[in-house]
Amino acid sequence: MNIRLKPCRFCGEVTAISSKSDAHRLLIVSALSDRPTFIRCNARSADITATVNCLNSLGADIKFVDGGISVKPIKEKRKSAVLDCNESGSTIRFLLPVAASLGTNTEFTGGGRLPERPLSPLREQMEAHGVVFSPINVFPVKINGEMISGEFTIKGNISSQFITGLLFALPLLNGNSIINVIPPVESRPYIDMTLNTLKKFGITVTEKSNSFFIPGGQKYASPGTVESEGDWSNSAFFLTAGAVSGRVTVTGLDVSSVQGDKQILTILKEMGAEITVEQGSITVKKGDLHGINIDARNIPDLVPIISVAAAAANDGETVITGAERLKIKESDRLAAVYESLKALGVDISKTDDGLVINKTGIVGGGAVSGYNDHRMVMALSVLSAVSSGDIILRGAEAVNKSYPNFFEDFSSLGGSYNVINS
């Protein structure tokens, strides 16, 4: 889907959709639990659907129902399964260890850039603990055998998803296990989300220094009903929309959440936006934005929308560092941000691990790609508020990966677009 975005001014209120990251985690632990679970969740994205379908293939019975998701857990382990992860990196990285802990011989398929996204650190540790993989660099990925407990060592600067996958699986094994994480650890808040979810479902994990001790033989105990938090990652786009143009209120976000992307509030405030936090709502109003320095190691998903705020600034230079891992996301996200903003007249340059963006204020119009990347599409849509002309955006359907109703909410806040043929 190609769209024409027109200059606009954002004003209004939206409710945050449920966190995709939280929903992934709740679905997996619910599928491994002792009894059914109802997850209150208002999001039905392509990634969440992929996780639901994969868990059903492993023996769960999960359905989207009014108000959320109904989960009947896996009762009988299946000897074999085919899991279509679509384009979801979270799904394949979380479920590789889970399937191996169940002893299910599994074929993992998928599309988009999923075959290119790294699995080697996780693969090496699983192979060292009894799991047989199909040849390296071959997709689909096939595994055989049941994973055994023991000591696992993972680098912390490639993907926290490897650690999360092991944290889900290791409590199910017969013996005790340890995960040693080699510093530096990036995206640490996502590990904290996993630990919180495990605790809700009765799983004990002890953290000491850079390691996690996981007793074996544990049972997941469902609390019956749980709620997926509001999504700070996707809400960041509309919070930033308020900062660059007008005034936007987002409801349904928890300021005490461990989601790392709530840091968007700190960043926007430091850049000069006016922010009001009240019971149940957050309002961001346009301010006199200026450039700042940002370490993105724990907030890589915010880089596209932070770059939009930086481009809209009236003063100073924004330097983003620690974002090297963006090269292996749904797109080479560093290159995507650079190329698209450059094409729209933004004064931007690349570094080895980030970007340097000089004040631009009003950007130009033009034609850009969405890079089949949901976060790029949403960021460029927000950028239309400070454009001097129309922006033609190709591949806008990529929002379905995480936020299928994005353009409905975009329009409700004053965003202006129409679908075009070319």
Spans of model-derived segments:
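Short, structured segments at the rim of ligand-binding sites
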Residues: M1-S422
